[in-house]
Amino acid sequence: MKQKLNKLEKYWVMYDVGNSAFALLVSTIIPIYFKNMAAGNGISASDSTAYLSYAISISTLIVAILGPVLGTVADGKNRKKPLFTLFMLIGVLGCAALALPKSAILFLVVFVITKVGFSGSLIFYDSMLVDVTTDERMDDVSSQGYAWGYIGSCVPFVVSLALIFGADYIGISGTVATAGAFIINALWWAVVTIPLLKNYKQNYYMETKTNGVKETVKRLGTVCGEIRNDKKVFLFLVAFFFYIDGVYTIIEMATSYGKDVGISDTSLLLALLLTQIVAFPCAIVFGKLAQKFETARLIAVCIGAYFLVAVYALWLDAAWKFWVMATFVGVFQGAIQALSRSYFAKIIPKEKSSEYFGIFDIFGKGASFMGTMLMGISTQIFHTSKAGVIVIASMFVIGFVIFKIQSQTMQRGEKRSLAVSRTWDEFEAETENDYDDYDYGYENDYEIGDMDFAEERF
């Protein structure tokens, strides 16, 4: 039976619509704006590319370090929402502040702060999933978040492009127009987040006696130990690390790879928009399919599809082939991220969701860092970006194998639990029958009228 999103689920989805606007800026307008600014500051093209890469790596590293600690703190009663709000505001205000710097280095400082706010807010946002919906609806709701995020982010993006390309017609410079685009996206991000801030309530939490650093570190160590001993969670995180490594690397490096094989800037930009548009309905479809098929099976399909995309990229030498690849990426991009998020949320303790998603974020951020690094190293060693693509393809193979092992571990665990449950039910039934059948010898021991005992049984 189909069920529409309730109000709280819609408000949760809307934050994906808001933050995705900044994510799209990071992969499109910000690199172009920064490189133009850097050139004006006398920084070479190669150095500006390196500086931007360093800034992204630094922000990724900061969140990877803070994530588990913040997640541990957020699992206390009524702490998740304030922390989410703090990091969301850092991201929103930082996005607007990107319009201010005239120095390339200062711009990167603001960018790092903004990226930390953006990524940090997602730790708490992802963990909110257990509070806003049920296990049965997690796949669908998570998929709706990614889907509407993809299509919703196109609204401020298109407005921003119209402002930038129409700057001459309204009498402003391209720099001023781009600065205005940052403010537009910041406002969009803030406004669509308001309903979630007003209505979210943390239902699952841990009762903590103290708030000290020692207690926080101790709890973090406990969670890491629990994950290490829980095969289904540990194996999933390892598999996730490898296959999401390939996904993130394709997202972040597709434009650079496309330019390397001769695709024009216009084709690359339009292909990126196509990916966003295609990802919208496909993410929703996969969320619906998860109601009929096992989530693990759908994730495996997505991993396999991404492997084929990576192999296809080796023969990429024309714009139309890039468009085909962009279409297939759009089909599976939202699905694999959404289903991975909901799958993880269903196999972890709900009262520790922030702690676990803090660890989850480390694996995702680590994968993002490692994937781009390996692609860069292999490309330099073999003097072709296709060598990097082969590395990406191998990540999907490793991730797929480990994920299948994790799925089999889950199935064995479920079978054992079912067997134990059936054995206990049978034991209770037999015990109940024994009590019903046993003759304790009290019946007819005496006649109520004269109280004469018929016989002594004991």
Regions found by a protein language model. Name each.
Residues 45-46, 164-187, 377-396:
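A membrane-interface helix-boundary motif in multi-pass transporters
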Residues 2-9, 201-237, 423:
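Juxtamembrane intracellular "pre-TM" segments in multi-pass secondary transporters
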Residues 142-164, 361-371:
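Glycine-rich segments within core transmembrane alpha-helices of 12-TM secondary carriers
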Residues 3-60, 232-271:
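Helix-loop boundary and gating motifs at the non-cytosolic
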Residues 65-79, 281-295, 379:
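Helix-to-loop junctions at the C-terminal end of transmembrane segments
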Residues 82-96, 297-312:
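Structural signature of the two symmetry-related core transmembrane helices
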Residues 188-199, 390-424:
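Multi-pass alpha-helical transporter architecture, strongest
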Residues 98-111, 314-326:
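Helix-loop junctions at membrane interfaces in 12-TM secondary transporters
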